[in-house]
Amino acid sequence: MKLVKMSMALLLAAISFSGIQAQTADEIVNKYIDALGGKEKLQEVKTVYMENTSQAMGNEGPSTINLVTGVGFKIVSDFNGQSVIIAVTNKGGWQVNPFQGASAPTAMPEEMLKQSKGRLDPFGALNNYAAKGNKVELQGKDGNTFKLKVTNADSIETTIYVDATTYYITKVVSTAQMMGQTMEVTTTFSNYKKVDPAGVFFPYSYEISYGGQFSITTTVNKIEVNKTIDPTIFDMPKS
């Protein structure tokens, strides 16, 4: 009888702990949404246009981002007169990368597409995560940041670090397929600023490190919210 009571107590404790973990993860996500401007303001963001300056391997060049929420994302980066293009839509994706021998538009590999779908939301995987089929688990704290594991509908896992004071995302760790191999990609974010008249916050500085082999540092020079963007720019050009 004592064994049964002890087992029941352990079971109830486990259920209780699980509930606390889930509630805590949701609480962190909600505070992140509030830090960016609040749910209502984020929902009003239909498009985002950015002009940036990026540095990679001693080279510097401009880049632009066009995003229509839930529809398409496109980034064009220019280095040494060469353009690198990555485009993702809710139906597929394509890319141009002359530095990897792909000067003509090519369809994005399925695995890369699964990893890139999150770009269709300007506020990332935590925004409306349940509606997207994402699962969020709190994995504790790392210094002054909460560590969240996000698993999307395609079972792709990402680790997101949220500052415990500001509730901004400071780092995202994921994996990517590049040059025939899987490597860890770490993106760090900083210098969050308010974009008016939308009243939402975006990071104006970020660095992407590819497996420690090389990195791209980007400074955002301009952000426009709800600017008219022609969705046909996301279409893959015909050869």
Residue ranges of each PLM-predicted region?
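Bacterial Sec-dependent N-terminal signal peptides
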Residues: 1-25
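Residues that line or immediately flank small-molecule/substrate-binding pockets and catalytic motifs
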Residues: 8, 52, 176
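Flexible, processing/modification-adjacent segments and terminal tails
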Residues: 21-34, 95-156, 164, 176-183, ...
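N-terminal mature ectodomain segment of secretory-pathway/periplasmic proteins
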Residues: 27-101
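Extracytoplasmic
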Residues: 45-47, 70, 131-133, 143-145, ...
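Short, surface-exposed charged micro-motifs
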Residues: 64-65, 83-85, 137, 157-161, ...
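A short, sequence-level motif marking secondary-structure junctions
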Residues: 65-72, 89-92, 110-112, 163-166, ...
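Gly/Pro-enriched, hydrophobic low-complexity segments
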Residues: 144-236
